[in-house]
Design a protein with these regions (language model features):
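A conserved, positively charged/aromatic
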Residues: 4-15, 28-30
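Nucleotide-sugar donor-binding catalytic core of glycosyltransferases
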Residues: 18-188
Length: 188
């Protein structure tokens, strides 16, 4: 969404779908007059009664966009080729993307010893070389622009986590209905 948010328009408002998204936009796009929070996902309608689990026609409905890992990595390679003409910058950017992918997939240890997700912003801040960033080695000097360039890595990680949850549910033999673009690509 970065290309649409960078312009310092007068009276510019945005809507965020979660609190982290809201904080992110407020931090990196201070020219926005207001960022409103609109909780869309997993929100219960006040107009309808909750159907008891045993009476539901669809026991578990899983919504999402599903893509193949190889396809997403190829899209990232294509983005590198398209965005960076200089082979050195292209390789620096690709290597940074792969390092980010590893860090995000590995997660981090929480205070109670469990593995938890690392948000892209935190993971990238931990691995990006600030001197290289300020020198433009990754094709930009702006951290928000760099994160936008790397959106496919974040998408890859979210997709991998989605597949992991689906595999877990399938292993439990819970009846599952998948809905969303690319659902047929899910190998269950």
């Amino acid at each position: 969404h970065h290309p649409g948010l960078i312009f310092p328009l007068k009276d510019y408002h945005a809507i965020a779908i979660d609190h982290c998204h809201k904080s992110y936009m407020e931090k990196y796009y201070p020219h926005l007059q207001q960022v409103a929070f609109l909780p869309i996902g997993a929100t219960q309608s006040r107009l309808a009664d909750v159907i008891p689990y045993e009476k539901r026609q669809i026991p578990l409905l899983f919504l999402g966009t599903y893509e193949s890992k190889d396809g997403m990595l190829e899209k990232f390679r294509a983005l590198c080729r398209k965005t960076f003409a200089d082979p050195k910058i292209r390789q620096e950017f690709y290597d940074l993307g792969m390092a980010l992918l590893e860090v995000m997939l590995a997660g981090k240890e929480s205070a109670n010893g469990e593995r938890v997700e690392i948000p892209m912003e935190e993971a990238l801040a931990g691995i990006v070389d600030q001197e290289k960033l300020q020198a433009g080695a990754y094709g930009t000097r702006d951290f928000a622009v760099l994160m936008n360039y790397l959106y496919l890595i974040d998408k890859y990680v979210r997709n991998a986590r989605r597949h992991k949850v689906l595999s877990y549910v399938a292993d439990l033999k819970v009846p599952l209905t998948l809905v969303g673009e690319g659902w047929e690509k899910v190998p269950l």
